[in-house]
Amino acid sequence: MARKILVWLLSFNAGFVDTAGFLGLQGLFTAHVTGNFVTLGAALVFGTQGIIAKLIALPEFLIVIVLVRLIGTALTTRRLPTSRIVLAAEVALLLAFFLLAVEFGPFPDSDSPTALITGFTGVAAMAIQNTIQRVHLAGFPPTTIMTGNTTQAALDAVDLIKGVNRKQGVAIRARLASILSGIFYFALGCAAAAGLYFLFGFWSLAVPVVVGVATLALRAES
């Protein structure tokens, strides 16, 4: 049960950080990094801010994943608690994201050095979360990207409606429940970020830090 709650909290955080980053950094996606291709195109067409930030987000994301993979392998070789250490690194980056955003924001120019550094910390945190999900929570649906989850949920719903055998039905229902809960908490994070950012600006990024600390506590128990 602790691992299931951990996944819910990670889904909430991904939705929150992605939405807050988008609102505060001129349309920069921190979790859904490939979405920056779309917003980059819009920035080029309409001449809006954030071209550099969107252009380098994906390379930054990939570099962090490579580093986390290499460090994680080294930690595992030394029989250290890899997942907890990596998760702690994500929480540290979320804290840095919050502190930098509060200190230097708002960012009328999201391509300024301070905005780029702030955005990078958010992207790096979500890159680590993606790696955690793929390596340490592979049995659960993704926590940061909901397109694939939504597709699988629709396919599972169709299969249940048209009818499957008992064994398949049990497996499909369990998977569908897991997927829908992830989508729900991601959407809840998005909604919470929108409301709290409207009220408190970048101070709202304290929420993912608190949630991140909770995930650390849960990971220690599981």
Task: Walk through the language-model features, giving the residues of each.
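Alpha-helical transmembrane segments of multi-pass membrane proteins
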Residues: 1-222
